[in-house]
């Protein structure tokens, strides 16, 4: 399975044709702002004691509970690193139409990638009730 690597502009265009934007940043990052229409399933969580990032052991289960393997998914994070890892995990798990968003939400200027915000694309501060991690995780518990 080949993972596509796309710009934020391409990700926005793909959203317009039915792709789901999966934001794999932490819950606090997502709550500070995210691409409009995004779903939040963190690849990593902030450990409350150490303040360090640690893997989310439920990542794949939550994605599977909410998106079929034939879903068109564009995966974004802050700069593109976590989303590349998440895209790899999903492709290995059988997801067939996965794209990593280069530059993510905040941009990666050191690699020449503009972020969602810098590109002037639509941003939201709050998620629809069914797109935040708590709601998505709840669906995984129903399985």
Predicted feature residues:
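Rhodanese-like catalytic fold shared by cysteine-dependent sulfurtransferases
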Residues: 1-20, 27-72, 81-143
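Short, surface-exposed ligand- or partner-binding patches at beta-edge/loop junctions that are enriched
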Residues: 75-76
């Amino acid at each position: 399975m080949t993972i596509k690597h796309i710009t934020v502009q391409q990700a926005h265009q793909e959203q317009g044709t039915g792709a789901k934007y999966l934001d794999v940043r932490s819950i606090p990052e997502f709550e500070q702002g995210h691409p409009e229409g995004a779903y939040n399933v963190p690849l990593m969580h902030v450990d409350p004691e150490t303040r360090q990032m640690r893997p989310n052991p439920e990542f794949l289960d939550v994605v599977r509970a909410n998106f079929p393997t034939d879903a068109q998914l564009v995966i974004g994070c802050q700069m593109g690193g976590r989303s590349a890892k998440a895209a790899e995990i999903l492709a290995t798990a059988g997801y067939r139409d996965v794209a990593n968003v280069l530059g993510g939400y905040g941009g990666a200027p050191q690699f020449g990638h503009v972020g969602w915000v810098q590109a002037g694309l639509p941003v939201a501060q709050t998620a629809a009730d069914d797109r935040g991690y708590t709601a998505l995780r709840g669906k995984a518990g129903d399985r």
